[in-house]
Structure formats: structure tokens, C-alpha cells
């Protein structure tokens, strides 16, 4: 089973860029592995580092700013996760330490992949995201409270409502990925298989 997500309080980092694609999130040269770990080191590699080997941090990239070290909530702009389909993108984000991405919109495939990997994509309106960017930039180091059960983000003195469909919310709150969902029906699967002719087993 995956880790349950019910509530999360975390440091927020503002990535003020629209149409951040999956190749920017995790460049293609790092996709050889099929395990989910180790990708965080290469998250936003071409933006975070000045060299190809990832040894010289770019001091002008927001994830490298001292006040945002340890951030677990990413604040982004519209169409986050667009581009080619690669599940490595949410792998890289979660391996780096992100639990939540807040944006006005997400690419459809990235949105679905995020739930499969216990990364919560929160959609808020453009105006609400503008407010949050202003709040974070005025208060570096601010933390947000994200409550999946209540479907709320508490930021400063305001509360922002978001909506996640009931099935995805149930899965995240119970730590159920595709394997976990299947195992919930293990007895029924075993009973079905037992009824099959021997040559089909």
C-alpha cells in the first residue's frame, strides 16, 4: 500500500512559470531507470543546475534559494505537467519531497499520474493562484495547510476550497494505488480463479 494522504502542512515554493512540461520536470536523459527512486536528484535538472552533470547549482533558480529548502508544496501556473507522457515526472517530484502541487490547471495525463503516485494536484482558479503567489512572495518561508478530507487549503488568513473526485480522494486517503485496489478484491479474485477449468489456471 502507498502512504495515506489526509492532511499535509508544508513549506511552499513558488515556481512562477506556465506550461511547465514533463521534459523540464525530468529531462529525458534521466529516464532509463524503471524504479521510482532517485529521480529527485534530477528534478528540473536543466533549471536547477548550470552544468550537465548537476554539480553546479543555479543560484537564480527558485528551488535553490535558501528560504525554500525542504519545500513540500509546489505553487505553479497553468497547464503544469504538459508535454510527453512520462510517469517519471511525478516520481521526480515525490522523490524530491513534494506532496502537493497547486496550479490553475494540469495536463490530463500528468494529473492522473499524480494520484497514482500519492502526489496531490490541487486546482484553484487563476485569481486564487495569483493571490497565493503574492502571499508567498511577500512571506518567504510560509507554510500552507492542505486538508484532502475537507478539500481545503489554508494559507495565511484565508481558506481556499478545491474539489477532488470521490474515487481519487478515497484512494489517496487510504493509500491505495492500483495494486492496493486489486488486493482489496483478493478473495473474489481467488474465488473466480478457483471456478475456472484446470487448463485455464
Swiss-Prot record:
Gene Ontology MF, one? 3-isopropylmalate dehydratase activity
Q: What EC number(s) has UniProt assigned to this enzyme?
A: 4.2.1.33
Which pathway does the UniProt entry assign to this protein? Amino-acid biosynthesis; L-leucine biosynthesis; L-leucine from 3-methyl-2-oxobutanoate: step 2/4
Which EC class heads this enzyme's classification?
A: lyase
Query: Reaction(s) catalyzed by this protein?
Result: (2R,3S)-3-isopropylmalate = (2S)-2-isopropylmalate
| Superkingdom of the source species | Bacteria
- Residues in a coiled coil are none
Q: Which GO terms describe its cellular component?
A: 3-isopropylmalate dehydratase complex
Q: Check the record and name the InterPro entries matching this protein.
A: 3-IsopropMal_deHydase_ssu, Aconitase/3IPM_dehydase_swvl, AconitaseA/IPMdHydase_ssu_swvl, IPMI_Swivel, LeuD
Q: Which SUPFAM superfamilies match?
A: LeuD/IlvD-like (SSF52016)
Question: Per the UniProt entry, what is one GO biological process?
Answer: L-leucine biosynthetic process
Q: Which UniProt keywords are present, listed alphabetically?
A: Amino-acid biosynthesis, Branched-chain amino acid biosynthesis, Leucine biosynthesis, Lyase
Question: What job does this protein perform?
Answer: Catalyzes the isomerization between 2-isopropylmalate and 3-isopropylmalate, via the formation of 2-isopropylmaleate.
Q: How does it assemble?
A: Heterodimer of LeuC and LeuD.
Sorted alphabetically, which HAMAP family does this protein's record hold? Answer: LeuD_type1 (MF_01031)
Q: Which family does it belong to?
A: Belongs to the LeuD family. LeuD type 1 subfamily.
Question: PANTHER family attached here?
Answer: 3-ISOPROPYLMALATE DEHYDRATASE SMALL SUBUNIT, 3-ISOPROPYLMALATE DEHYDRATASE SMALL SUBUNIT 2-RELATED-RELATED
What is the protein name for this chain?
Answer: 3-isopropylmalate dehydratase small subunit
Q: Which organism is it from?
A: Shigella dysenteriae serotype 1 (strain Sd197)
**Which gene is transcribed and translated to give this protein?**
leuD
